[in-house]
A protein has these predicted regions:
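N-terminal Sec/SRP start-transfer signal
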Residues: 1-7
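Alpha-helical transmembrane segments
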Residues: 7-33
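Hydrophobic, well-ordered secondary-structure elements that form the walls
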Residues: 20, 78, 109, 122, ...
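C-terminal structured "cap/appendage" subdomains that terminate the fold
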Residues: 125-134, 140-143, 154-155, 173-176, ...
């Protein structure tokens, strides 16, 4: 390769490492900002609120539904967001970097999925889940670094779906809890038959950072 080629590869390696290692912080402190996530067994809004309102450790929350769906040859998630989601889920236009609204009769689409589908703001996209086919206008292409997502609000779902909306996820804000207190809270939540699991966002950040540290060895080599 020669000296110039080797130097170019070294610079490329450092650049890749720096760009990838920013992803956990960008996703979990900029795009989504919950402290923990509860996973429900497809409950009504009233059932979800009963669980959440009865726990004093939860300072605030937002309820949503994440559903597997297909668009073209790609597997995606449809995320239907209920009230108060703006506290935890933040949408930034890929081009302008400005915050986006999740308007009625529109969807927001994550940037990697938009690139794969070659769609942009203002286009109409068709996708389907187990119960419905959707033809929706793209309100904006937004930043997202994990999985492929299409986001819509509750009113848009109810207008376009033949099935009543249930909820399988909640983002929650916690007070200052120690690790032991978090584990106790998790065990308490899992005693409820409507709760399938509870995870903490800091654990996800730590796991992602641990995996990314392996890049240091690659860069050194």
């Amino acid at each position: 390769l020669g000296v110039a080629g080797c130097c170019a590869l070294m610079l490329c390696g450092f650049g890749i490492k720096d760009s990838i290692t920013d992803i956990p912080a960008r996703q979990f402190t900029h795009v989504t900002t919950e402290d923990a996530t509860l996973y429900f067994n497809n409950v009504t809004k009233e059932e979800a609120k009963e669980v959440l309102n009865n726990e004093t450790s939860f300072q605030s929350y937002a309820i949503l539904n994440n559903t597997n769906a297909t668009i073209g040859k790609y597997d995606i998630y449809i995320s239907v967001l209920s009230e108060n989601f703006e506290e935890f889920q933040h949408f930034y236009d890929l081009d302008t970097k400005e915050k986006c609204d999740l308007n009625d009769d529109e969807v927001l689409i994550s940037d990697k999925l938009a690139s794969l589908l070659k769609v942009k703001k203002g286009d109409t996209i068709e996708f389907y889940d187990d119960n419905n086919n959707y033809n929706m206008k793209v309100g904006a292409v937004v930043e997202n670094y994990i999985q492929h997502f299409i986001f819509m609000n509750e009113r848009t779902y109810n207008k376009n779906s033949s099935k009543d909306l249930t909820y399988n996820t909640a983002y929650v804000e916690l007070g200052d809890l120690t690790k032991d207190e978090q584990l106790d809270l998790q065990a308490k939540m899992l005693e409820n038959s409507n709760v399938l699991n509870m995870t903490f966002i800091q654990d996800s950040i730590d796991q992602a950072n641990d995996m990314l540290q392996t890049l240091d060895k690659v860069v050194v080599i």
